[in-house]
Each structure stands twice: as structure tokens, then as C-alpha cells.
Amino acid sequence: MRAKANIAFMKIAVVMSLALSTAASAQDKAQDNRTFSSGYRFVEMTGEELFGNVCQGCHMPDAAGAIGAGSYPSLVGNRNLEASGYPVYLVVNGRRGMPGFGDMMTDGQVAAVVNYLRTHFGNNYQDVVTARDVRDARR
């Protein structure tokens, strides 16, 4: 009788484990809605998506920057973002260790990520960068 109880307990434990692991896996997939670019151009369209998939690899998820194999400046409360043309220039052309992303982003994508940086992470620069501003800066 005890053996039957142990077998029943084991079956219940296996079923519960499978159910919990499936639920956890579904939750992980629901929270990880990032897009991944394939090819030479980024497919992300919002500033948040672009920052999350392009910029945060170096500047960190909280935009605090890092020092290690290189020096990645903090974007938190960064006064260099005040003049909108400067971050547009950096994203398009790069500088020092930062590559330029101008060939990989449309004018709208550059504007989106610059506007996101200028209005998040302790930055409150409300003048909006447009795709036309980026196009004009590329000339």
C-alpha cells in the first residue's frame, strides 16, 4: 500500500513540476518581447526598442555607462544631450569607440532613439528631433 502511495505522490510531483515549468517558460517569453534585427538594418522602430537592442549593450540598461574593456559614458542626466544636434551626430557618425549607426538606421529611427534618450534617464529635453532634422544633419 505504501508503494502505491509513493508512486501516486511521484506522479503528482512530476505533473506539478511540468505545469510550473511550462508556466514559467510562458511568463519568460511574454516578458521578453524584444525584436532582433537580421541583416544590415535595424528593424526596431521605437526609441525604447532601439535603446534596448542597440545602445544598452554598451551604455547599460539604466544608461549609467560602464568602464571595463572600454569607457562607455553615462547618458543619465547628460548635459551633452541638451543640444539635439549633438546626439544626432553621434548616433549617425559615431565617435572614438562608438560606431556610427547612420547606415543601419533610418532618419526616423535615429530621431526616435535620440528623443528617447533626451526624455528618459533623468534627461528632460522636450524639444523634439524629427526625421527631417536627422536628414538635414546627414548632409
What are these regions (language model features)?
Residues 47, 51-61, 113:
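The canonical Cys-X-X-Cys-His
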Residues 11-21:
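Bacterial N-terminal signal peptides
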Residues 28-38, 107-139:
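Flexible coil segments in periplasmic/lumen-exposed cytochrome c-class electron-transfer proteins
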Residues 2-13:
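Bacterial N-terminal signal peptides that target proteins for export
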Residues 43, 83, 87, 109-110:
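Stable alpha-helical elements in mature extracytoplasmic
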Residues 60, 64-104:
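Gly/Gly-Pro-rich "capping" loops immediately C-terminal to redox-active cysteine motifs
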Residues 24-50, 66:
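Electrostatic cytochrome c docking/interface patches
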